[in-house]
Structures are given as structure tokens and as C-alpha cells.
Amino acid sequence: MFKFFRNKLQSLFKKNISLDLIEDAESLFYEADFGTELTEELCARLRRTKKADASTIKDLITVLLRESLEGLPSQASQSSQTRPIVSLLLGTNGSGKTTTAAKLAHYYKERSESVMLVATDTFRAAGMDQARLWANELGCGFVSGQPGGDAAAIAFDGIQSAIARGYSRVIIDTSGRLHVHGNLMKELSKIVSVCGKALEGAPHEIFMTVDSTLGNNAIEQVRVFHDVVPLSGLIFTKVDGSAKGGTLFQIAKRLKIPTKFIGYGESLKDLNEFDLDLFLNKLFPEVEKI
């Protein structure tokens, strides 16, 4: 993961703190999509530091990134009486939503949860077929509708079916939509409202899948979605060698939305709960002594 950032950082760690290093760090952070605020703060701290070794530089950057994630809302723990727990998955076209829904179902099933997968993407028959195949492979319950049907009604039926059949988790996959399409964005509000009618407090989690390769372009998408429905957290998809990593920290600092999961690869197992320490270990190369 993050080969771009790791390779550049390795070169940076071999330099003493100087004007050239600060300029290189500034360029790197901008290239890696950390944005103006974080980049300027990094450079300011580099200028103030007295010690010029690789470990100091790494520690300085690590502290800054940790600080950017401070004060984020934590996911309220669901009461043991709340069953099923409903997770609504939304995002733009091509962000890997349906595959992520399957990975999330696998994640919960590995933790002894019974999962109902609900496919509401009535605009794309292939999307519903894909979700059905995943559900069959995973042994999940499955509810879908007819092409062109009412997505909110399907969500309602899915939750009601899960309640009747005793499922502990419901994952609702929605159709991909661009953040600039007003009517499709309004549909999300309707789905959220109808979920609450099917089960009080639902949806308990609203996750947005974010294509990590989009970089800064993802920030405005997340902001618009968050304005329409309150996002509980983000699931970054396609986190591989081409992903730069900085967008996650920008969104956390600017929009106060936490990252909940990281998705990489095509396997159902390729979804991890976001762990900051593990993430930073993968983000940074091993520090060599100067």
C-alpha cells in the first residue's frame, strides 16, 4: 500500500533538516493529497525543530497526522436490545459499493453475525444480480426489488424481513450516484426516513464508500453526501499502491468524519477495520539511520 508516499518519504528521511528538505516535504505532502492546512503545519513544525535526523522527522509527521484525527465522533455502541443493526451503504458510481457490501457482510459473518443483504440499486440490474451472487456465496439472507422500483420501499421490506427472520445485521446497498445529481441525492434522505419507519433508530450506521485513488476530488463528494445524510463513517476502497493516503486525514480534519474500514484487493477478506497504528506503519517506510 501507498508505494508512492513510502518511496518519497524514504528519500526524505535521508536528508538533514534544511530549506531543501522543507521544500521537498511540502511538495510530497501536496502530491500525496494532504491539502494546504496539513502541509503548511508540517512545514512550520519542520522549521521549528532543532534535531535533524530521520526518526525526528518521522515522529513529527506522525504526531501531526494523529492530531488531525483527534476529536472525531466515535460510533455509539449499539444496545444488545437493538436487533437487527442496520448499516446503509452509499457512494458515487464506481466506488466499489456493492463489493464493499459483500466484504462487510463477510466481516460480520466472521464475527458470528447473521446478515441480511438488501439490494436497492434498481437502476442497474447487474448490480442486483451481483449482490445476489455475493449473498448466495456468503450464505446471507437477500432482499431485492424489480428494476425501476422504489429503493426506499425495498429497504423497508428488507428490514422488516430481517426482523421477522431474526437476523442480527442488515446491510443495505444503494445505487451509485453523483453528488451533483440533486434528485438522486434527495432519494437518500427518503431511504433514511423509511428505514426509521421500518425500525426505530435505523439506519444505525451510514457508511460512504470512497475511492481512495480520487485524491482531493473525493473531498467535495463526501461533503455533499454528508450535507444530505449524516455519515457515520467512511470506507476507503481501492487502497493499493496507487493510493496516496492524504485524503483520509484531510477529510477527518475538515469534515470531522472518521474512517471506519479500509478496503483493498478483490477478495472478500480484503476489508480491515481502520486501525491508526497499523495504517501509519504501512504509510511510513522503515527509518534508516542517517
Curated annotation (Swiss-Prot):
> What residues form the membrane-spanning segments?
none
EC numbers: 3.6.5.4
Q: Where in the cell is it found?
A: Cell inner membrane; Cytoplasm
Gene Ontology cellular-component terms listed: cytoplasm; plasma membrane
Question: Looking at its record, which EC class is this enzyme?
Answer: hydrolase
What InterPro entries does the record point to?
A: AAA+_ATPase, P-loop_NTPase, Signal_recog_particl_SRP54_hlx, SR_rcpt_FtsY, SRP/SRP_N, SRP54_GTPase_dom, SRP54_N_sf
Recorded GO terms, molecular function? ATP hydrolysis activity; GTP binding; GTPase activity; signal recognition particle binding
SUPFAM superfamilies this protein is in?
Domain of the SRP/SRP receptor G-proteins, P-loop containing nucleoside triphosphate hydrolases
Q: Which Pfam families match?
A: SRP54, SRP54_N
Query: Which keywords describe this protein according to UniProt?
Result: Cell inner membrane, Cell membrane, Cytoplasm, GTP-binding, Hydrolase, Membrane, Nucleotide-binding, Receptor
Q: Which GO terms describe its biological process?
A: SRP-dependent cotranslational protein targeting to membrane
Q: Which reaction does it catalyse?
A: GTP + H2O = GDP + phosphate + H(+)
What domain of life does the native source organism fall in? Answer: Bacteria
Q: How does it sit in the membrane?
A: Peripheral membrane protein
Q: What is its main location?
A: membrane
The record's note on quaternary structure and interaction partners says:
Part of the signal recognition particle protein translocation system, which is composed of SRP and FtsY.
**Protein family membership:** Belongs to the GTP-binding SRP family. FtsY subfamily.
**Role, per record:** Involved in targeting and insertion of nascent membrane proteins into the cytoplasmic membrane. Acts as a receptor for the complex formed by the signal recognition particle (SRP) and the ribosome-nascent chain (RNC).
Q: What is this protein called?
A: Signal recognition particle receptor FtsY
Point out the gene that encodes the protein: ftsY
